[in-house]
């Protein structure tokens, strides 16, 4: 009977040590997860804003080189195309400014409407002046 009590007491001590070890392992796992979260957030990748900003900057550079590489004879058709693109931008900007809630998209949509309108009307004025150069002068 004494051997049985010693054996039971040994099992109780072993189970107590196993419980303490599991609690310690759980605390270490929690601590490790808290240490990893900031690193995981930092390596998550660029936000959507930076992707869109990169596309915008690349579009500006490509547009600059396309416009300045065009021969003078093709500037009139190029202006017509940019006016058409600006009208599409105005439609998209009107959709962006549509929601009632005040947000960044509403502000950016307003500026898009403003800049595209300046581009459209300026293009019409320049086109009108260019066409006036080809009219016969009245005597």
Swiss-Prot record:
Localization terms from the record: Cell inner membrane
Gene for this chain: pntAB
Organism: Rhodospirillum rubrum
Enzyme class name: translocase
UniProt name for this protein: NAD(P) transhydrogenase subunit alpha part 2
Pfam families xrefs: PNTB_4TM (PF12769)
Any one Gene Ontology molecular-function term assigned to this protein's record: NADP binding
Annotated GO biological process: NADPH regeneration
Catalytic activity from the UniProt record: NAD(+) + NADPH + H(+)(in) = NADH + NADP(+) + H(+)(out)
Major location category of this protein: membrane
Quaternary context: Complex of an alpha and a beta chain; in Rhodospirillum, the alpha chain seems to be made of two subunits.
Record's function text: The transhydrogenation between NADH and NADP is coupled to respiration and ATP hydrolysis and functions as a proton pump across the membrane.
Cellular component annotations (GO), alphabetically ordered: plasma membrane
Domain of life, per lineage: Bacteria
Its membrane topology: Multi-pass membrane protein
């Amino acid at each position: 009977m004494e051997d049985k009590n010693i054996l039971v007491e040994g099992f109780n001590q072993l189970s107590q040590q196993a419980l303490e070890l599991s609690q310690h392992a759980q605390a270490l796992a929690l601590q490790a997860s808290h240490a990893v979260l900031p690193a995981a957030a930092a390596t998550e990748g660029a936000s959507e804003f930076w992707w869109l900003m990169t596309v915008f900057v690349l579009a500006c550079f490509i547009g600059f080189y396309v416009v300045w590489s065009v021969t003078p004879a093709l500037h009139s058709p190029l202006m017509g195309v940019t006016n058409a693109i600006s009208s599409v931008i105005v439609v998209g900007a009107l959709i962006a400014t549509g929601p009632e809630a005040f947000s960044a998209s509403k502000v950016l949509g307003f500026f898009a409407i403003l800049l595209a309108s300046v581009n459209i009307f300026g293009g019409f004025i320049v086109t009108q002046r260019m066409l006036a150069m080809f009219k016969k002068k009245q005597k």
